[in-house]
């Protein structure tokens, strides 16, 4: 009779050893509570995915959000991050600072949340694969999570039939050389991604 009572605390302790602890440190302009809840709910799905591949048990994410792009660019200059003059992306992940930085929320709440999911995915990939993960994998996973929504059934990707057809057509017409694409460096990959 005592054995089950003695084993129960051991079972709980072992469960805690396996628990994933992810802390998000918010900085910059304040986010509404609803956005924080959405981010934390979404991140739980990302963490469950990346845990399968060796994501550390305890992890701190730094998320720096700016409402205004101009303030974000000034901040980047102050921390010695220099972007090209015509840089159009709405967010970056800085491996040097280990921080996701959102460069303005002018495009609205839904779009900025998608960018946050994208940039935090870069952090997870680097935690697993180190400083130089393959560009196609790093960007591919980030793009995947950027285009997902949380539903009652879990995470659902918003990949449209048009996008599926376009990729299939590009491959069938030989517009994509998958071997070269997989082996391309960051610069070449990013150039191809823009097309």
Report residues per predicted region.
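Sec-dependent N-terminal signal peptides
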Residues: 4-14
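Alpha-helix boundary/capping residues
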Residues: 11, 79, 148-149
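Short intrinsically disordered, low-complexity coil segments enriched in acidic
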Residues: 13, 119, 193-194
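Residue-level marker of positions within ordered structural domains that often coincide
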Residues: 14, 68, 147
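Sec/Tat signal peptide C-region and signal peptidase I cleavage site
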Residues: 15-19
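Juxtacatalytic substrate-recognition/specificity segment
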Residues: 20-134
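Acidic/His/Gly-enriched intrinsically disordered linker/tail segments
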Residues: 84-94, 100, 129-195
């Amino acid at each position: 009779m005592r054995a089950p009572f003695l084993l129960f605390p051991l079972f709980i302790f072992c469960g805690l050893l396996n628990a994933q602890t992810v802390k998000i440190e918010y900085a910059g302009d304040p986010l509404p509570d609803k956005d924080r809840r959405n981010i934390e709910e979404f991140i739980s799905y990302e963490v469950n995915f990346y845990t399968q591949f060796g994501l550390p048990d305890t992890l701190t994410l730094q998320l720096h959000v700016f409402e205004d792009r101009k303030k974000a660019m000034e901040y980047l200059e102050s921390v010695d991050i220099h972007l090209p003059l015509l840089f159009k992306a709405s967010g970056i992940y800085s491996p040097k600072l280990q921080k996701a930085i959102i460069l303005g929320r002018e495009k609205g709440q839904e779009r900025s949340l998608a960018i946050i999911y994208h940039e935090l995915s870069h952090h997870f990939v680097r935690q697993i694969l180190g400083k130089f993960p393959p560009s196609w994998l790093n960007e591919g996973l980030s793009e995947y999570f950027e285009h997902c929504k949380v539903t009652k059934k879990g995470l659902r990707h918003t990949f449209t039939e048009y996008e599926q057809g376009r990729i299939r057509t590009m491959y069938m017409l030989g517009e994509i050389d998958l071997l070269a694409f997989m082996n391309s460096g960051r610069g070449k990959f990013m150039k191809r991604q823009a097309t």
